[in-house]
């Protein structure tokens, strides 16, 4: 892994991210906006799946998901920029790997939802009860995104401090 880190830090892209002082703060702003979209919308949808806000049809909550995906793409690009800029601060940081774990868990949970539970819940209207499996998926998703938030916030304080 060290050879990869050394190579990545020697690239023009990595040096540019660190050298141009406006890139990092701009990426942080975009990352925060993206995270707000992802966690806000996914959290709203997850809470509906868990049985809260029953006055909202599941399809109405799901209609916001393209915005959540846009936020996720914003985070993917800016997160990659953070990693490329200073990979040595991430590869040995337990908080980074915990964040990656929760991101993967959220993704696998979303795939599980789409391939199993989603078809049974998408047409639920206002007042309809969601199946227990949907409630579990919603809870796992919400906890996954909270894990992403927590471990992402802990990055500067745990492991290789920034």
Language model features: what each stretch is:
Residues 1-162:
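Polytopic transmembrane helical bundles with strong interfacial aromatic enrichment
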């Amino acid at each position: 892994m060290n050879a990869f880190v050394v190579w990545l830090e020697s690239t023009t892209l990595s040096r540019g991210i660190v050298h141009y002082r406006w890139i990092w703060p701009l990426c942080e702003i975009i990352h925060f906006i993206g995270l707000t979209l992802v966690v806000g919308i996914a959290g709203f949808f997850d809470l509906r799946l868990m049985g809260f806000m029953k006055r909202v049809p599941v399809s109405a909550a799901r209609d916001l998901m393209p915005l959540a995906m846009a936020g996720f793409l914003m985070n993917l690009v800016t997160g990659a920029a953070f990693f490329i800029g200073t990979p040595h601060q991430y590869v040995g940081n337990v908080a980074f790997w915990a964040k990656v774990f929760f991101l993967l868990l959220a993704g696998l949970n979303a795939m599980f939802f789409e391939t199993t539970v989603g078809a049974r819940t998408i047409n639920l209207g206002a007042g309809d009860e969601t199946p227990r499996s949907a409630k579990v998926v919603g809870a796992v998703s919400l906890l996954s995104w909270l894990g992403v938030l927590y471990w992402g916030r802990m990055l500067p304080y745990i492991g290789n401090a920034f």
